[in-house]
């Protein structure tokens, strides 16, 4: 098999670009399990990256038809070894319009939907919210994403109910319950994450979202009964898929469920006449950026993918074993990955037979922009960029504009963004910012020829 070799010397060159001068290794404690986290480029072991354009049996990808087969081979590897098998499509998809009104100072039509997955409307339900530019003359593209603590946090609109049920705790929640206090908080310019609805509408895009906690809960590794990770995490839409077979090592995971929900959101978009669902953008920040990337890798209907600040398990190379790594992932986030992934933790550089550049490649030839966050070394922006470089030949092979061949770009440097594939990073706080939204929409405009 043709491979791409990344040596310690290459890592040292990349280290010269990083803004973090300190060299250190820290220890995280996950319920008594001590896990080392490396933040020292010089400690990264040499590793080998598999070539996305070479089959497991050594055959070269020679045509677009070959690539379609190779893509399925790669997705099967990730299903069996990391993210778990892909959830099945639901037996039914009921999308009930709850209400509709003119909003956003008259510039949008806002609709709320309840989505059920059984014909009798029993079982799990996801609440989707949608804004459509009111004055558009033809169907518009749509940006879809999952939010963290409820649709009511996106805008100041009293008609949007506060998220009920379990919610990931935050400084403005009531423990694991969402709060009226968080209504519209993503309209606050000082928030780590914002939702610039007015800008999105003015750029000619619809926007849709749902709360990921309604898909399936996301308890922390240290949560106590009845919310402990090993059982409570597999509720919500997991109820659709029957009892888990714990003898399997490739069961459906939380990341797989959240990605599945994004595809169901696209199902809804396809039913809305004012939306051109063939021009869809999927995004998300942090763990929801991981979910967006997985959704686009699996579902070719997503035309543009812009995962934001994914951290380990998303865009960065796992074999670097830097920042958020396989060992932290399998102990802190046991429900995000299938049990087969555990075996790679002792030595990812030697044991892994795949890496995240291959997942990025599964989006090709569609448009992919990786947005990084440089303030925290946990996010490993160098690893993101190396993954992009290793995936770039696939876009070139398929005849699409690939990522420009430029040195590792500094924060806010747009030189690594191509027409169909690119990379950009920034500093400041962890969250999806105005910069991130602007870069996303500019990239989507180029992809759609706007």
Predicted regions and their residues:
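N-terminal pre-domain segments of enzymes
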Residues: 22-86, 443
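Cap/lid segment of the alpha/beta-hydrolase catalytic domain
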Residues: 145-264, 268-271, 314, 318-320
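Bacterial N-terminal signal peptides
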Residues: 7-16
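Primarily recognizes the serine-hydrolase "nucleophile elbow" in alpha/beta-hydrolase
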Residues: 257, 263-325, 348
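Short beta-strand element of the alpha/beta-hydrolase
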Residues: 127-129, 138-148
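C-terminal catalytic histidine-bearing segment of alpha/beta-hydrolase fold enzymes
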Residues: 332, 336, 389-450
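Conserved strand-to-loop "acid loop" that flanks and positions the catalytic carboxylate
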Residues: 364-379, 426-428
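Mobile cap/lid helix-loop segments that gate and shape the active-site cleft of serine hydrolases
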Residues: 237, 304-359, 384-407
């Amino acid at each position: 098999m043709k491979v791409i070799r990344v040596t310690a010397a290459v890592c040292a060159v990349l280290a010269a670009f990083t803004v973090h001068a300190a060299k250190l290794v820290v220890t995280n404690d996950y319920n008594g399990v001590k896990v080392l986290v490396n933040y020292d480029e010089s400690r990264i072991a040499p590793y080998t990256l598999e070539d996305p354009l070479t089959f497991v049996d050594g055959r070269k990808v020679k045509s677009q038809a070959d690539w379609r087969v190779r893509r399925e081979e790669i997705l099967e590897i990730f299903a069996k070894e990391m993210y778990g098998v892909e959830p099945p499509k639901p037996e039914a998809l009921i999308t009930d319009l709850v209400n509709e009104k003119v909003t956003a100072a008259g510039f949008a039509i806002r609709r709320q939907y309840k989505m059920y997955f059984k014909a009798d409307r029993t079982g799990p339900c996801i609440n989707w919210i949608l804004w459509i530019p009111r004055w558009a003359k033809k169907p518009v593209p749509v940006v879809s994403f999952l939010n963290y603590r409820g649709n009511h946090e996106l805008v100041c609109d009293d008609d949007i109910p506060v998220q009920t049920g379990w919610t990931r705790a935050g400084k403005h929640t009531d423990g694991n319950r969402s709060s009226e206090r968080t209504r519209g908080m993503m309209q606050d310019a000082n928030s780590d994450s914002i939702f610039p609805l007015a800008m999105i509408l003015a750029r000619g895009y619809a926007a849709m979202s749902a709360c990921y906690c309604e898909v399936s809960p996301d308890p922390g590794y240290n949560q106590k009964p009845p919310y402990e990770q090993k059982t409570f995490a597999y509720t919500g839409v997991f109820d659709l898929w029957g009892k888990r077979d714990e003898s399997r090592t490739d069961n459906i995971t939380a990341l797989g469920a959240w990605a599945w929900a994004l595809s169901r959101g696209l199902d809804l978009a396809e039913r809305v006449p004012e939306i051109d669902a063939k021009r869809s953008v999927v995004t998300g920040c942090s763990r929801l950026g991981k979910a967006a990337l997985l959704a686009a890798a699996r579902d070719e209907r997503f035309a543009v993918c812009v995962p934001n600040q994914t951290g380990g398990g998303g865009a960065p190379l796992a074999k670097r074993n830097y920042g958020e790594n396989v060992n932290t992932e399998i102990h802190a986030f046991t429900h995000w990955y299938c049990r087969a992934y555990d075996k790679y933790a002792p030595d990812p550089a030697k044991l892994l037979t795949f890496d995240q550049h291959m997942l990025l490649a599964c989006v090709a030839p569609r448009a992919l922009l990786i947005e990084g966050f440089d303030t925290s070394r946990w996010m490993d922006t160098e690893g993101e960029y190396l993954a992009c470089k290793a995936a770039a030949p696939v876009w070139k092979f398929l005849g699409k504009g690939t990522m420009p061949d430029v040195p590792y770009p500094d924060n806010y440097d747009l030189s690594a963004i191509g027409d169909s594939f690119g990379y950009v990073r920034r500093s400041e706080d962890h969250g999806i910012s105005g910069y991130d939204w602007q870069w996303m929409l500019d990239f989507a405009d180029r992809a759609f020829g706007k």
